[in-house]
């Protein structure tokens, strides 16, 4: 017994007829691959983090265990473990993890910028001498003028005698301590 075309249409349940009105969003295979690769890269970033930084990232127990295992594995096993971490991330919302990583990277960038600023201050102190000390005291009012001037004089003597820059390092450490106590 053959069914006619009209009979096939009559056999369709009512709720499936309404599905034709719903918009279907097609995602290309390439886009799916790009997203999977991005999540695998996110997993690789997690694996490259240190233990303290990893504790600041909101991860569930399974994902944290997989990341810690990947940190211990070498060679080909590591690649497979990274793929597993990427797969685990696809099943989760990666947004909070990415946000936490961005915050960590931003904090690192701020610290690098501060170190560059302190290096420039140190170099100015060594080159220009006591003329820069009032500028330092304006930035860091609790700085010890006498200690700073002593370190600057020693650094200038070391530079003139082509000795290792021990006092220059001490100036940088002192400026870093001042910056940390100011914050």
From Swiss-Prot:
SUPFAM superfamilies: PSPTO4464-like
Gene Ontology MF annotations: ribosome binding; rRNA binding
Chief subcellular location: cytoplasm
Listed InterPro entries: DarP, DarP_sf
Gene name as annotated: darP
Full protein name: Dual-action ribosomal maturation protein DarP
Keywords from the UniProt entry: Cytoplasm, Ribosome biogenesis, RNA-binding, rRNA-binding
Function noted in UniProt: Member of a network of 50S ribosomal subunit biogenesis factors which assembles along the 30S-50S interface, preventing incorrect 23S rRNA structures from forming. Promotes peptidyl transferase center (PTC) maturation.
GO biological process, one term: assembly of large subunit precursor of preribosome
GO CC field: cytosol
Family of this protein: Belongs to the DarP family.
Cellular localization per UniProt: Cytoplasm
Keyword rRNA-binding: yes
Species: Pectobacterium carotovorum subsp. carotovorum (strain PC1)
Disordered, as annotated region: 1-20
């Amino acid at each position: 017994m053959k069914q006619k075309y009209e009979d096939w249409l009559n056999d369709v349940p009512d709720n499936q007829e309404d599905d034709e009105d719903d918009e279907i969003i097609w995602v290309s295979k390439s886009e799916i691959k790009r997203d999977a690769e991005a999540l695998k890269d996110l997993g690789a970033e997690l694996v490259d983090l240190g233990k303290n930084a990893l504790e600041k990232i909101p991860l569930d127990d399974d994902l944290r265990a997989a990341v810690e295992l990947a940190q211990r594995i070498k060679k080909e096993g590591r690649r497979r473990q990274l793929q597993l971490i990427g797969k685990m991330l696809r099943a989760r919302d990666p947004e909070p993890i990415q946000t936490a990583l961005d915050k960590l990277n931003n904090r690192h960038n701020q610290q690098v910028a501060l170190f560059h600023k302190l290096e420039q201050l140190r170099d100015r102190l060594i080159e220009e001498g006591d003329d820069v000390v009032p500028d330092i005291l304006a930035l860091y009012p609790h700085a010890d003028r006498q200690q700073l001037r002593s370190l600057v004089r020693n650094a200038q003597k070391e530079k003139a005698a082509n000795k290792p820059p021990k006092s220059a390092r001490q100036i940088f450490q002192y400026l870093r301590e001042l910056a940390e106590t100011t914050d």
